Amino acid sequence: MTQMSVPFDEAARTIGRRCLCLRVQRASRAIGRQFDDAFRTIGLNNWQFSLLMNLNRPSPLTVTRLAEELAMDRTTTTKNLKPLERRGLVEIRRDDQDARVKRVILTEAGRALLTEAVQHWTVAQQKIEASLRGSDLASLHTALEAITQS
């Protein structure tokens, strides 16, 4: 086993400054907290908002497809859907052609809450974008998309 040629403290500082994983995780948590705060008054969190937004389409998604859209595993997606289902915001039904497949449907109550949530999202999004003044948001979006697609 070889020893590190860089002292640990120096390596830790370098990683702290340069590690994309660490920096993106920190930024994600900070942004997530801001959206959680924005949605709190309507009883949602940012993950639930993301689920509802992804279900707002003409045809219901399968649980597997929803998980893929959110870059989550199927089990975590199912777990995160349960509170929304209990609140009557989504329905999970067996597919008509294949009983092994489950489809997720946004209910009218879910659609109504989502409409309200979009207003809260808009305020939070504008606040976050304002905090990034001077940054090139288009480049940030492009870089994040490139990371997501790699």
Stretches found by the model and what they are:
Residues 15, 22-25, 29-76, 82, ...:
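N-terminal helix-turn-helix DNA-binding core of bacterial DNA-binding proteins
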